[in-house]
Amino acid sequence: YTCFTTDVIHAGHLNIIHEAQKYGDVVVGVMTDKALVQFDRFPTISFYERKKMVQEITGVSEVVEQDSIMYDTVIRKIKPDYVIHGDNWCKGPMKAIRENAKKAVEAYGGKIIDIPYTYDPQIKELSRKMRARLAMPEYRRKRLKQLLGIRPIVKALEVHNGITGLIAEKTVVEHEGRLDQFDAMWILLREILVLVA
């Protein structure tokens, strides 16, 4: 089992699939919009488009819905022998996700397999372009409307300079096995308050 949180399949994802095939049938979880906004960023395509994209990857046996950033519920449901992920989840806030998956899979004798993370300048550039696309005003308005429908509480931070903007954008906090981050930032421009989601 592995899980994808992406709008675009790149070499790193294909590497995970290739490595996972060595252990048997590959089941891929696709995070729902609700889970994705808690984990990484707002999706640029719908859950169903992401699911279809993953289903079309050679080597994927089955695609399942993952409705949480934590893996325990889906692991208990499908009981994979292995949970395979890039080793980027071994440190930082993502470590809580790994620990959650490890506890769930080891409860019945399964194993975690950490694959060396694929560092590629093209992947970094792709990520930068996706974030730039999400920064366009028409996407921000659309995202805010969607976010208000997905999240019971939208967390925003008032930003008044570049540093506080980066804090709002980059901060991810792990607390008691859960990850959290800001959903939006309030920007005060010449007495006009703007919400950027």
Briefly describe each language-model feature range.
Residues 1-137:
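Nucleotidyltransferase catalytic core that binds NTPs
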Residues 13-22, 162-181:
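Short amphipathic alpha-helices and their capping/turn segments at secondary-structure boundaries
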Residues 23, 152-154, 182:
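A general structural motif
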Residues 131-173:
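N-terminal amphipathic alpha-helix/helix-capping segment at the start of soluble metabolic enzymes
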Residues 107, 150-152, 180:
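A generic structural signal for short, non-catalytic loop/turn and secondary-structure boundary residues
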Residues 33-36, 162-165, 189-194:
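Short active-site-proximal "capping" loops at secondary-structure junctions
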Residues 172-197:
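Glycine-rich, proline-tolerant flexible connector loops at the mouths of alpha/beta enzymes
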Residues 28, 155-161, 183-187:
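Hydrophobic faces of well-ordered beta-strands that scaffold small-molecule active sites
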